[in-house]
Amino acid sequence: MAPEISIVIPLHDEEDNVEPLVQELTGVMRSVGRPYEVILIDDGSADATFATLRRLQAADSHLRVIQFERNFGQTAAFAAGFAHAQGALIVTLDGDLQNDPADIPRLLDVVRTHDIVCGWRRHRQDAFLTRHVPSVAANWLLGLVSGIRLHDNGCSLKVFRAAVVKPLKLAPGMHRYLPALASQLGNRVAEVVVNHRPRRSGRSKYGLSRTIGVLRDIIGLRGLMRRAIDPATDASRLYTVKQILEAGAERCR
């Protein structure tokens, strides 16, 4: 049966988090009771993330694994997941267990009357000065530039209608601005408070340099939006796939 829901998860050096994440997702999606797939993108991990994914995928036909040639970044991983997603709805979340899969059913309920539903980490469980404060500033600036006021554009836990995101051509870093772009194109965007958990294992990939990059991107947002919907934009070099693991097949690229 073709999946109705595609769950897209970028992973970079998350060897200790990926198995418990898949276990949580499996329980949640069984309770949802709709056909689904989980697309896990190994974004050039240097640890045992891919080996763990290979083992998990061999035992679960819901899992599809995409391995990149090297680390291309989160936007590239999301873009690959969107390109391979078969469901009419696409759920995105981080692979570090800070997003709570138990929130997915509530977002799926809200998307019945919207095109994108964004998670809002009202009570963030990470560093106040280096993560929370820059996030507040970036969300304020993005609202000023784009006209859409969301509390938490950076939360990866979102649900999209596939018809909204599949046609878009993403530039590096652009995954954060999909709600703003979708709103500009006339789509309905909602925001739902979600749980945010402390990181259990591994280390955060975010730092000051990424915050500066986000602020720079927001200032140039209108240009990014034009590129995303321009038929002449070539997004084919955003990432290179090394291999794909899925039920009954292992393909090298």
Residue spans for each PLM region:
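A conserved acidic beta->alpha catalytic loop
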Residues: 42-51, 97-98
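Short aromatic/hydrophobic "clamp" motif used to bind/position activated sugar donors
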Residues: 90
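Hydrophobic helical membrane-anchoring modules
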Residues: 1-3, 173-253
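Conserved donor NDP-sugar-binding/catalytic core segment of glycosyltransferases
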Residues: 105-129
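Glycine-rich, basic loop-to-helix element that forms the pyrophosphate-binding segment
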Residues: 68-85, 106
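Acidic helix N-cap motif at the loop->helix transition within catalytic regions
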Residues: 17-19, 47-56
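N-proximal low-complexity "stem/linker" segments adjacent to membrane-targeting elements
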Residues: 1-27, 34
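Short beta-strand/loop segment that forms part of the nucleotide-sugar
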Residues: 34-44, 66-68
